[in-house]
A protein has these predicted regions:
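Helix-adjacent hinge/juxtasegments
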Residues: 56, 61-88
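Solenoidal tandem-repeat scaffolds enriched in leucines and small polar residues
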Residues: 128, 134, 143-150
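Alpha-helical segment of the N-proximal tetratricopeptide repeat
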Residues: 7-31
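Amphipathic alpha-helical scaffolding segments comprising HEAT/armadillo-like alpha-solenoid repeats
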Residues: 1-12, 33-45, 64-76, 95-107, ...
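Short inter-helical turns and helix N-cap capping residues of alpha-solenoid HEAT/ARM repeat scaffolds
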Residues: 16-17, 47-48, 78-79, 109-110, ...
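Core register positions within helices of long alpha-helical scaffolds
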Residues: 27, 58, 89-92, 96, ...
């Protein structure tokens, strides 16, 4: 298994194709372990936005708390796909005060980011997200409104 992880790390770090690097990030998110985690955190600086998105999502899958601060930096990135991936990953990672980090995304100009934020807030089981999720139920984008509705259902269940 170590050889396979090493091969994916090598591909992530040196493949010329951004798709190959992104695939490697996704695979490393399945394996975990310290070497994979270190490579994924490093990949957050890849020149390709596609690779950075894949690395962020993989770190979320791994619940990599050590990546929280780097992922939080993506929440203000000009690229909506990076903001959304960071929101999803941070929702999976959780932690103290994570809702307060994600709540400003309620007003993001990108519907995809607002939807990702709604999903993430629904995973955190934090009552402080209730008002924002209630407002997002009225979002003009139906996907965002649906994500907020589903998040509220999860939040209510977690608080019982």
């Amino acid at each position: 298994m170590d050889e396979e992880i090493d091969a994916w790390i090598s591909q992530l770090q040196s493949a010329h194709s951004e798709d190959a690097r992104a695939d490697a990030a996704e695979e490393l998110g399945e394996f975990g372990g310290a070497p994979a985690l270190a490579a994924l955190i490093e990949a957050l600086s890849d020149p390709s936005g596609t690779v950075r998105v894949s690395a962020a999502l993989a770190l979320g899958e791994l619940r990599a708390a050590s990546a929280s601060s780097a992922l939080q930096g993506f929440l203000t990135n000009p690229q909506p796909n990076l903001r959304g991936a960071a929101a999803v990953a941070l929702g999976q990672i959780g932690g103290p005060n994570m809702s307060s980090v994600l709540l400003p995304l309620e007003n993001d100009p990108s519907a995809a980011v607002r939807g990702a934020a709604a999903w993430a807030l629904g995973t955190l089981a934090d009552p402080s997200a209730y008002d924002a999720l209630t407002r997002l139920q009225s979002d003009p984008d139906l996907d965002v409104a649906d994500a907020a509705q589903e998040a509220l259902v999860r939040l209510r269940k977690s608080l019982r």
